[in-house]
């Protein structure tokens, strides 16, 4: 069948009329603490009507209806050229590929809009653009109550990605509690924030699993549907006016998917604007949508009331093959260019595939043309119309400029520190890590058992081992920090939850117990077993130098991980870097050629080694350098070439490295 001729449809030109008349300011079911979660302690119960009204007023104040408009959105990405094309000049760079092509729409408070389309049609790109998180240049306009995307709009917007980015070792209650402490306004007390967590847990049906860990990977935890509800709950805690979700039912069974969509519908009925992408909804799910936007290769072919989609396509000549067809399946077939009388795939021979593709492309072009003729003019008129929210939003936006962050810097730091310690408690002092450090320390102590100054080369080797081992170990632990945290950091910073500085300092401070206690145990065991100078002062100074070296090495690892954001690449570069520091440290090679001698001045192991030797030996100390001969320790070739003098310069050099590498890591994170 050839596509119907493009004709003026008798379909009414107001397809966006909502079949559910819902006031955008209905009472918010999350605004009154009517549900109590038994998972929390009795101390967190509410205190009475005055307390309830105060909390309710703050949360109701935060729920400001948002009318979302987007007009003629166009977005393109660069097409990658085949390998070798630039080397041999056989191919020219491919033109940019259009992902979105003149997409328009409007969603009002109380409405649930579903974006439908086959894979690669641009659904995720569109919802990401509407959430203000799309990288690159987007042409067209997106407005929120007539204003562009601002920090105040960001704080009123919830965005749930397709992949649930959650900490696997935290429980459901802990996850939502930390989110509430970070995202809810500082006008609420801690007790009131915990009560908001109770209500969200109860209303999303998470009471049964509130004390279960999230899980993920090899960690057994809650189900996929429960994980998705936790992700939605994180956004619902802030009582968003606009909620956007990317395929929230992906990978879920039909019952769980229906429960998720029913939750979204009830949230929309509370006066919110809800937009979601969905891949292949059942007829039961489809009936829950107020509006649908159907995309085909980035172009809209329908935008309007979900209950009138069959009527519209029938009016332009496209009828389903059966009267009992799922509307979602029907429109997805049309988006792929497949009509009811298109030949079945198994009936098409190889030589007929080209004709089939041409027919499908013809159907798509016909649908796009019909949309532009019949649906786009009234939609454009509605998008251009001014609503009351557009007139009042400027005043609210000016007021919100002074409150960019929901909580203070110290509150963000303390909550992030507690959350980080809780999440990483399983690895901070894991049995495997303790076993490794204890094994190496005991083995080192036995190998250097009660060494004497007479065996000066052995003692100097032990000091160099201190600097190298506690350079490698913290560096390789640190390079995985930010690559592993990257998805969570991007998600939370995109939502404007906290300052990067509070996260960065909390993350580095939280690692200090793990990074400093283990080397302290190591040095304590190895120092006394190895027969180094039996002086408490010298021991403490040796320990301080090793810990200083650990902090510098950790900074190098953090910088490499933050800059590369690829653990494998960072580990490879770290191996090469530490090998250079090892060779240029001053132990293996005392006479480095002048043209490459500068390497030792960028090696933190070199400065650590010099400091360890400097505090271990004095100028008047001697050792047995031959039969009956005693020589000054400082005249020993391996020590003499270190040129030990004023050790404050070495301390200063390490301080510069300590500061420089951590600043580099911070700047790299700002560019995420």
From Swiss-Prot:
It is a multi-pass membrane protein. Residues 68-322 form the ABC transporter domain. One of its GO terms (cellular component) is membrane. Residues 1-35 have a biased composition (Polar residues). Pfam families: ABC2_membrane, ABC2_membrane_7, ABC_tran. Keywords: ATP-binding, Membrane, Nucleotide-binding, Transmembrane, Transmembrane helix, Transport. It is found in: Membrane. InterPro entries: AAA+_ATPase, ABC2_TM, ABC_transporter-like_ATP-bd, ABC_transporter-like_CS, ABCG_dom, ABCG_transporters, P-loop_NTPase. ATP binds at residues 117-124. The gene is ABCG21. Residues 411-617 form the ABC transmembrane type-2 domain. SMART domains: AAA. The keyword Transferase does not apply. The chain crosses the membrane at residues 429-449, 460-480, 512-532, 543-563, 576-596, 649-669. Belongs to the ABC transporter superfamily. ABCG family. Eye pigment precursor importer (TC 3.A.1.204) subfamily. Its main location: membrane. It comes from the Eukaryota. This is ABC transporter G family member 21. Residues 50-59 have a biased composition (Low complexity). Residues 1-59 are annotated as: Disordered. GO terms for molecular function: ABC-type transporter activity; ATP binding; ATP hydrolysis activity.
